[in-house]
Amino acid sequence: MNSGPKVSVIMGIYNCERTLAESIESILSQSYKNWELILCDDASTDGTLRIAKQYAAHYSDRIKLIQNKTNKRLAASLNHCLSHATGDYIARQDGDDLSFPRRLEKQVAFLEKHRHYQVVGTGMLVFDEFGVRGARILPSVPEPGIMAKGTPFCHGTIMMRASAYRTLKGYRSVRRTRRMEDIDLWLRFFEEGFRGYNLQEALYKVREDSDAFKRRSFTYSIDNAILVYQACRRLKLPLSDYIYIAKPLIRAFMPAAVMNRYHKKRVMNQKEGLVKHE
């Protein structure tokens, strides 16, 4: 039986000096207290490492700080965190996002009660420099078919059983999955026959600035299309789903301003009753 923390929160951090302290404070403020936070600095070039060191020194019993000697990107950083994690449950958080106080409490309670689920996600509020723009609430029980159309879980919100992460061997750190390590993870997750659940309330805040779509290259869109194709083939989805392979390619040719307007409309187009947070 694990005598250490029940939950390991893993956070890959890179050049997030403006937001890191607030993100860490949101974990320190959790109503659920049996956790450890593992930070992996990915060779930051700003003040991120200095801030992380301050928190790790002040909360040495709760916060572990590890470092990549060179910049290896998010998947490698998360795997580095996983190699140091001791919890039965692994929770994700990004260094520019926030968790509401009862997030960990509610996710632990769900996994303790529902042993047949390997992961539990939550809804999330989307915010930028101007405030909250909307919410994203995904289906409560996503089926493999969702992989052709979009993501089954909001990656930053998840809590997964450590045993499931071990079975999946963590994240694949290869060029094809850069910035899509979560999509690749969910493809392998469904291939393994695992099941997940999304709590129908927003317990997380994700920061999406106005330049989010300017940073997505055509190469990214090609790799995204390849992953959609692999999902259709490996999960044996119906032929009608193959049309979604074109979706990331179409988006690649859309002006960033158009994509931002579409995205803003999409996140705002949620049922108001679903946007609960505690």
Swiss-Prot record:
GO terms for molecular function: glycosyltransferase activity. Keywords: Exopolysaccharide synthesis, Glycosyltransferase, Transferase. It holds the Pfam family Glycos_transf_2. SUPFAM superfamilies: Nucleotide-diphospho-sugar transferases (SSF53448). InterPro entries: Glyco_trans_2-like (IPR001173), Glycosyltransf_2 (IPR050834), Nucleotide-diphossugar_trans (IPR029044). Induction: Repressed by SinR. It is an enzyme of class 2 (transferase). GO terms for biological process: polysaccharide biosynthetic process. Its EC number is 2.4.-.-. The keyword GTP-binding does not apply. The keyword Glycosyltransferase applies. May be involved in the production of the exopolysaccharide (EPS) component of the extracellular matrix during biofilm formation. EPS is responsible for the adhesion of chains of cells into bundles. Required for biofilm maintenance. Belongs to the glycosyltransferase 2 family. This is Putative glycosyltransferase EpsE. It comes from Bacillus subtilis (strain 168).
